[in-house]
Amino acid sequence: MKIVVLVKEVPDTYGDRKLNLETGLADRAASERVLDEIGERALEVALSYADANPGTEVTVVSMAPEESAATIRKGLAMGAASALQVVDPALAGADLGVTARVLAAAVQRAGFDLVITGNLSTDGAGGVIAAMVAEHLGVPQATALSAVTIGETEVSGTRATDAGAAQVTATLPAVISITEALPDARFPNFKGIMAAKKKPFETVSLADLDVDVDPASAPQSIMTAVSEKPPRGAGIKITDEGGAGEKLAAYLIENRLA
């Protein structure tokens, strides 16, 4: 069984998040960069299966800037056998469509029986990458699973719905996405951290994947301008000298708030 886990470097949830007003992209220097927690949970699903099924190979795949290699290597420290990182300046600011095309090509290069990813990243929260990657790969999908069972020929799981829960099954090869209902990821130990330095880590470009991300090659969204939200006004302070109630009522009526 060859399992590919899609992981992503994101700004630390507990740090500051800022936009670069010149580029409209996230300011990567504003906070510490970490491996997305939902991606770690997806990796835990794969590693737990590998622990119980010797011979299973787990590979982490990510599309990220060159300096993100150290973050992605955490996946190797956790237990993945290898990593593949797509690095290319042309991918800065890539939309969901481009991201899905590139990740699908990277997954094909790595080889797979099952692809696992988180349902929502903590920065973009698009929630569609799993389905889009599956479409590009031409394989079944099962998304937003709160429980997963991996078999030799199929993968099944539980998806929460407004009416309760639905049981879904997909024949392998397939793509699935998981929710935060799945267990927390394991912590890398010292042995794993040291071993990660010697594990295969392949860095590829768009040319290596034979993917063209020129806007003319496929429909995509491009940010043309971004501006900072203007600060709120200071408001009006009412001092109570016996007539504060009347002043407040007049203010609410004037601004159509009452």
Regions flagged by a language model, labelled:
Residues 1-258:
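N-terminal glycine-rich FAD/FM-binding segment characteristic of electron-transfer flavoproteins
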